[in-house]
Every structure is written in C-alpha cells, then in structure tokens.
Amino acid sequence: MASMTMRFHPNSTAVTESVPRRGSVYGFIGYRSSSLFVRTNVIKYRSVKRNLEFRRRSAFSVKCGSGNEAKQKVKDQEVQQEAKTSPSSFAPDTTSIVSSIKYHAEFTPLFSPEKFELPQAFIATAQSVRDALIINWNATYDYYEKLNVKQAYYLSMEFLQGRALLNAIGNLELTGPYAEALSQLSYKLEDVAHQEPDAALGNGGLGRLASCFLDSLATLNYPAWGYGLRYKYGLFKQRITKDGQEEVAEDWLEMGNPWEIVRNDVSYPVRFYGKVVSGSDGKKHWVGGEDIKAVAHDVPIPGYKTRSTINLRLWSTKAASEEFDLNAFNSGRHTEASEALANAEKICYILYPGDESIEGKTLRLKQQYTLCSASLQDIIARFERRSGASVNWEDFPEKVAVQMNDTHPTLCIPELMRILIDIKGLSWKDAWNITQRTVAYTNHTVLPEALEKWSMDLMEKLLPRHVEIIEMIDEELIRTIIAEYGTADSDLLDKKLKEMRILENVELPAEFADILVKTKEATDISSEEVQISKEGGEEEETSKEGGEEEEEKEVGGGREEGDDGKEDEVEKAIAEKDGTVKSSIGDKKKKLPEPVPVPPKLVRMANLCVVGGHAVNGVAEIHSEIVKDDVFNAFYKLWPEKFQNKTNGVTPRRWIRFCNPDLSKIITQWIGTEDWILNTEKLAELRKFADNEDLQTQWREAKRNNKVKVAAFLRERTGYSVSPDSMFDIQVKRIHEYKRQLLNIFGIVYRYKKMKEMNAAERKENFVPRVCIFGGKAFATYVQAKRIVKFITDVGATVNHDPEIGDLLKVIFVPDYNVSVAEMLIPASELSQHISTAGMEASGTSNMKFAMNGCLQIGTLDGANVEIREEVGADNFFLFGAKAREIVGLRKERARGKFVPDPRFEEVKKFVRSGVFGSYNYDELIGSLEGNEGFGRADYFLVGQDFPSYLECQEEVDKAYRDQKKWTRMSILNTAGSSKFSSDRTIHEYAREIWNIEPVKLE
C-alpha cells in the first residue's frame, strides 16, 4: 500500500509523490523542507522532480570497499546510466543562497518578519544550510537502506559539537558563496556565525571525542550513526564572580536549534520500576511501573568534500498525553496532575545531575537507561525493516556494531538481552552470543576506583528485569572463572571471583557457594597443622605484606574524558586504598567493637562491559598498557584477544582548516596541495622547510594575527588588556586536582614573587613576558576544584593590576570555556600545559589540537603526551616530572615521612598565606599539599614533588622563546609531527579492527 510522502530538494517546492512507505518512520523520508527557490525560478520544478524520482527508484553509483561485489553492483543498468548524468552534489550559487536566507527570514516562525537583525540572520542562514544538507542526508540514508550494509552505532552520554554553521558550510565547500550572500545582505559571515550558541550536549573531552569521530565517520564515508541525549540545560553555564565559579543553567535552546529535525514520528516507550512475572509460556514479562516516551531529534552531520551525511540522533523524554491527570487538574491539584509529565521531562534537563541524593542517583540511572533502551529499540527496528520478511537474528552482529563510549551506555548489554529473549523469543544462549558479538567498549578511566558502580538495590527497584539478567551474566562469568582456575587453590579462586565478578558484595549463588565451601574445607583439613604453626605475628606480617603488594599494582588515575561529578567519591576511594583515612587504631582507650557495617551491594559496570562485549580498547598506548596490566589485568589474562589500543584523535577540519585559516593557507602553499586535510600524513612534508626563513616569517605572522584576535576577545570577555607580543601560555581543560592547574598557578605565583624582588631592568632581563590563560569548569559539587578556580582568579586580580609588573605577566581565567572558545585560543597559543600527574590521564585530546596548530607543549609522560613527544621529537617537547612507574613509590615515601619539600615550594605557600592575593582563607587548599597522611591531604597528586622540575622546565621554555628562530622551527615541527593524531586514523582503526565496517561512498 502506497502513501503520500514528501520528498524534497533543498531549493525547491515540496514535491508530493506516491512512493512506498519504506523507511518513513525510521528514516528521514517525510521531513518537510521549505519551498525556497521555485519562487525565484532558480531551479526548475521538473528537474527537481526527476532527481527525486531517480533517488526513489534506486540510489547512486557507489564506491564500496567491502569486496562483496554482488552487494555493491547496481542491478538496474538504466538507473546506473541516469546516475552518470545526474548531478553528484548540490552547489547553490550566491543568488540562490540570498533567496534562501530571505525566505527563512520571512517564514521562520521564531522571529517577527519586521526585523532582520543578527539573531534572525543566523537562524535564517542556518536553516538555509540545513536545506542544503537534507538532500545528501536523505540520499545517504536511502543508500544504507538499499545496500543493507553493516552500520556502526556510537552511543555516548556526551557530544560536544560546538557551533555548526562554519563547520557545515566548510564541509559543503560553500564558505565563499555564503560569505558573499551575507555580504549582499549587509552582514559578515563571521558576525552571523558568532550568534550561534554552542550546543550544550557535553562537557569535556569525552563529548568532543565523540563529535570528532562523527565528523571523521562522515568524511570517510563509513555507515554510522551517533546516539545521545538532548539536554535542555546542558551541564551549566559558568560565571566568574568575586567568589569564584558560579553555575547557572545553559540557555542554548532559548531560540530553538535550527539544525535539528524533531521526529515526533520516531518515539519509543521506556519503562522504569514495575515487576517481573512469569507467563504461562514460561517467559519472563516486565510489567507495570512508569512508562515514558523517548522522542528522536535528528541532527545531520556532513562529511568534508563528500555527499555522505550521517545522523546524530538525540533523545528527549516526555510522558504520553494520557498520563496527564485531567480530573486532578480541574480539581485544582495542578502539580499532582502534571507530575508524570515533569518526571519524564526532567530526565533530559541537565548533563550529569548531582548524585549526592538518592533522587540524583535515580535520575542519572534513568538517563543512562533511556539512552540505551531508545537507541537499541531504534537499531533493532531498522535491522528488522532492512531484513525484510524473514529476520535471521544470527545476522544481527553482521549488520550492527554498537560502541559504548565509556561505561555510561553499559545497560545496552542487559537491554539487548532483554529484547532478544523476552520480546523476540530467542534462547539465552543465542541472545548472549549475539550480544557479545555486537557490543564493544571504550575505557576512559585508569583508576580502578573511578570505574562506575551502581547500587544493586537502586537498580533492582528501577530496572528489575535487567538485574535478573545481570545476575545470570554474573553466573556465566563465575562458571568461566571456575573453569579457568579450577578449585584446587581456593584462595586464588576466591581472589579472582572477588576481583572479576560483576556483582560486588553479593553472595555466590548456592551451586557455586557449595563448591567453594567443600574446596575450602578440604584445603583447611590438609593444612591444619601448618596453619596452627603460623599463627600470631607471622600472620599479621603476611597480611601487611600482602596489602603492600596490592598497593604496588596501583598506577593511579582519574576519569579521562568526561566529568560526571564523581570526584569526591573517587578521592575517598583513593584515601581508603592508600590507608590514609583516619583510623581509631592506636587509641589508648579500650572501646567496645563497633558493628561492622554491611557493605553495599554494587553492580560493576566496567566489568559488565568487558564480559558482555567482544572488544575493550584504551585511548592511548600508555593507557592501554595500564588497562591490561592494572585496571583489567585478570580479564586480560582470561581474554587477551579482547584488548586493543585506539589512540584518540581530533578532526583536522575543525581544528586546523576552519579554526586557523591563516595557518591552513600557509601549510597548503608549502606542501603544494590541500590533500593534507584528508591525509594528514602529508603534514610531515613541512619538516624539510622547518629552517626556511620565508616559511618561518609567514608562520610567525599567522600566529601573531591569531594572538591579536585573542587579545581583543579577552578584553571583551574579561576586561583585561594583554599584549600580543607576550608569550601566550595556555591551560584549558576541566578543573581537576589530577590535571594540576594548582601546579601551574603555583609556578605563576613563584614567578610573580621573584619579579617583585627585582627592579624593572632585572625583571626585563630575567623574564619573558607571558599571558597565562586558564579555562575550564569545576564540577558544581567538587569543592576543591572550585577553590582552585577562586585562587586563579584572585592571583589574576592582583597580578593584572600591579603597575610594577605591567605586561611582563598577566593571568586570565576565561569563563565558560567551550568549543568555540577553544577554536579561538588554540590557534593563538604558543605554549600549552598538559601537566597531569603521570599515569592519571588516559589520553587527552586538547594536546593533539595544540600540536596541530604549532603550539609547543610542556608536560609529563602521561596519556597521549608520550606519543606526541615521540612524533614531534623529544627536543620539541618540554618534559618534566615523575614517571608513572614511580608514583606509587613516591606516595609510600610520603606516607613514611621521607618527602622533603623544595624550599621554593614552601616559599610559595608562605607567600600565598601572607594575604597578598586577598583575604580568602586558602588553608584548605594549601593543606591538601601538606602532611603525610589523611583524607584530602598528603599531596596525593604530587604537586610538591614535581614543583622543582616544573620550575626548571619553565626556565628552559623562557630560554627557547627568546630565540624566535629556534622557537618557530620547533613550532613547525610540532605541526609536522601531528599527523598521527587525526581522528580519521582512529576511525579507520575502529572500523577495521572492532566494527568490521567498510566505506560506502555516494557519487
């Protein structure tokens, strides 16, 4: 049965034609674009309809690397011939773009047509660009449908997209025409682009990585989609006041999002609470509870110089209309009447809601399950539709790859099992086989204590059927562990079970408990005499040594990319592991033994990811080794084939080509081609020109032009004036103790103190002028991080108003750091700081962006720093600090009172306490760097340990900067050595080695 479906060319009247309903619910067919250009006769109706009919009948000639010729041949030779004569892409001219913008300015309902000011100009321009995306967006989806290719689905709680306008027209190669069109309308493209708010869908590198990956997937023509949540208020907007950081709700959706298409026809039910019952057929049924609807919002993601345009599908949540209690409302009980609606909508209010309360924890778990459930229902519906009349579930892993970006989407595993078993009727064995072959997991965490865990009681209440499935998976794992290690050594088996089980502090199922009890009894009887002889002091010593041995395994770490507000919990876990929590042992008064608290039952999400997926990858070489040797060592020994490395990358389109056009032109001029944008290996050709004076002159001019722009931006944003002739020294990333902004600002304080001790001539001779720029958000409940923000701003307020110092030193904290601010700062940067405690950063991606833009780096051997230093050359990287393998030993020395602080470090602390930076009490902040034990003390992140080498390294920075020819050469070599860190390379590796997908290119 045919239905009337609307198919559109972006610059034409909507064309109504009778086509099969194929895909109208789950694809893009049916989206109503605006009629724009028929009124101006730019594109003829008949040619538009002919092109649309061609798209409907079959798709396009295709380049496909799968090697399966039978799938890739287009059978209809007539359509093939027509494809040769059809335009391969849409390239509007300036006149048609002007007409398009005018149309949207008049008919877009967000604004009054009486005015055409900058906000209206942005919305109208964005909608015009979106129209240009629709044709490729539909064609890409249609072709995936036709070929039924294997498709990757990237699930992430964050997508930090940044502004979309310049990126979209850049990828479409329409920057020039749009700039000219807006000029004819009396606007500058740059001014219009600045009206766009950053999409508040992420916070840190976790979300930015996901967005870079989408750009690369589209550019490289891989069949893939992203799935996330549509947060109404984002994480928060950061304001800096005299009291430090203040958080307010993001307002990025205040004027709507012109890039998204609301898909009210694509929604899925998501259930919470309820109970599990067994039906007459013996099957489990999850019934009752609270139902909400997840509604799709689609955002087209264009590739660079390709027709491929993939999709980012974001879910919003709402309650069904029948959930509104009309009787209660009419009775005056308005809050009660709309309670269900409010409960549903708040799931997607903010990213990472505070989880100190049970309500906050519940909301976070609801967010994670909503993402997983709605996305999997959508994926499965697409698989079934593409499969046609006969669905073979064994083919599911051959058509679908699901990548979990960190542990937030872990519930994909039990949810896929639930759907396959309870709804599709598969056996446990078949469902488990399919799930393991479909799902893969990216780890971003190097500290075992930071791995996500959920209360089993909470999960059992909220998702009762999923807990049953997780318990069964845990039983499968127990069987595997027993089969691997046997029962002869009960202590070893017990250790492995405690380390590897998905459920923590949960008793073994009866069948396994009996095995262990019998084994333990046999072992105890056979060794009874030996045990008696070893009672007493020896036993205590053995226990002590065992504890130290466990400590030796620790490398330390924090959550790599995302900031989900777990810092306080992680710090407590660290303290407990180190034995630095205050204890009553040694209290001289005898006390009655306190009852031992029952440890909470927990679900270890990372363990579930490892068990339930077919691949586990780290995000930098050193991180992947830590994952194998420490974080998941027991699993690595059991399944070494699962573990891989996929060093992160960033898209060179956004992070050089579009954000740094001056440098891009220079690179193209000297390499002789723009191919480096798609093939970054060509950047290495810059090495042979590194000493060329003409290139160096151009390089410095481009850098200074960017610095002038940043100086104007800083004056507007912060009120501080800076000199573009100073060195721009930048540290921008979320505020966290392990990232050590405190080390940076302590170094600045030391520099300031030394300046104050000199006369003007001495200061000028001994110090290179610097502008020290900070940016990043502290999580709202992370008190120590917020103290660091306050301290930085206090130092800046003092230093920047000191007439004796002038332009020799400025300290600027940029509020509300985001992608757009990064695109401004990174091209202007000359030194960037990546100074985390060694072994605690999984990878990092900002270091890659800085390197691409010719910025020198000072840092530790941590995360991707290790590989960046290898690629750019050790002589072009300022290295300092302890190595990862030394960290545990240094902490032990501190605990034993062997650490002797550097006098310069003590000097800085005393200077801060003198009140020179204001009356704020910094005892808590400085106290965290003092003492040898105690929670929140003992300098866990080794600021004092690395302070001397950091200062000495900064002296080397000053020395190098004075020789501008040498510095410029180093800068060029950083760009030349950054080719490895393109997200294109990373995506190729994922596609080949984890997802098993091939490029599919529309022509």
From Swiss-Prot:
Disulfide bonds: none annotated. Residues 537-553 have a biased composition (Acidic residues). Found predominantly in cotyledons and early seed coat. InterPro entries: Glycg_phsphrylas, Glyco_trans_35, Pyridoxal_P_attach_site. It is found in: Plastid, Chloroplast; Plastid, Amyloplast. It catalyses: [(1->4)-alpha-D-glucosyl](n) + phosphate = [(1->4)-alpha-D-glucosyl](n-1) + alpha-D-glucose 1-phosphate. The keyword Transit peptide applies. Its cofactor is pyridoxal 5'-phosphate. Residues 1-64 form a transit peptide. It is an enzyme of class 2 (transferase). Its EC number is 2.4.1.1. Transmembrane segments: none annotated. One of its GO terms (molecular function) is pyridoxal phosphate binding. Belongs to the glycogen phosphorylase family. This is Alpha-1,4 glucan phosphorylase L isozyme, chloroplastic/amyloplastic. It comes from Vicia faba. The lineage of its organism: Eukaryota, Viridiplantae, Streptophyta, Embryophyta, Tracheophyta.
